């Protein structure tokens, strides 16, 4: 399928899933552009996508320097970030959507040259050992992230379980939604507003369970 047809199909599926969702939320489509070239990214932008997600610093650095609409597209880092690459990541990206340890959060906080760096905290709701992220518990380490003055933590992110079971996938997304509410209650404010749940294979389920961001390969 041609890229433009694929993007339009994804938008249609998002709109249909929103109608099935009881949460009446806005949903941001993040185009996961790994392996896509700058011309394909520009096509996505022209079709109405305003956010892209990259998960490899080196690959992203080459592309983003050449992208004509560099300043108009919101650039999100969505992969596992090593602490030794934080400085470069901050120069390239507007947000870091995969803060998975307190150590990483502190490194971003101390390295940021901005008043605030927008972030999502990654939560491992599936319990799969190969996945990164905090456990869905109100641990001291997790709560400490919210006291870092240079971080603007706006929500949570999770990756659904590697399964064909719709029940298990929904359960993982439901757990993140419930945990967001628990954190807001613990903090005494509605600080967290965003839920990044759903990728190419399960983004419709994510939206039905309240996701406000989906990461879809184009």
Describe the role of every protein-language-model region.
Residues 211-218:
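Gly/Pro- and small hydrophobic-enriched strand-loop and loop-to-helix capping segments
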Residues 1-201, 207-209:
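Conserved alpha/beta-domain cores
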């Amino acid at each position: 399928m041609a890229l433009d047809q694929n993007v339009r199909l994804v938008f249609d599926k998002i709109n249909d899933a929103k109608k099935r969702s009881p949460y009446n939320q806005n949903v941001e489509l993040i185009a996961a552009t790994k392996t896509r070239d700058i011309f394909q990214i520009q096509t996505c932008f022209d079709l109405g996508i305003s956010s892209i997600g990259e998960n490899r610093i080196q690959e992203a650095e080459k592309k983003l320097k050449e992208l004509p609409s560099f300043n108009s597209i919101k650039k999100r880092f969505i992969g596992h970030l090593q602490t030794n690459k934080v400085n470069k990541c901050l120069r390239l990206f507007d947000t870091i959507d995969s803060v998975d340890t307190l150590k990483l959060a502190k490194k971003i906080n101390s390295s940021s040259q901005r008043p605030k760096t927008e972030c999502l905290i990654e939560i491992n709701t599936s319990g799969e050992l190969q996945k990164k992220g905090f456990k869905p518990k109100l641990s001291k380490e997790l709560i400490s992230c919210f006291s870092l003055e240079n971080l603007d933590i706006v929500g949570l992110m999770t990756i659904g379980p590697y399964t064909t079971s719709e029940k298990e996938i929904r359960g993982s997304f439901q757990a993140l939604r419930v945990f967001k509410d628990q954190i807001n209650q613990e903090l005494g404010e509605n600080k967290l507003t965003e839920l990044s749940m759903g990728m190419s294979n399960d983004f419709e389920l994510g939206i039905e369970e309240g996701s406000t961001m989906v990461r879809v390969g184009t």
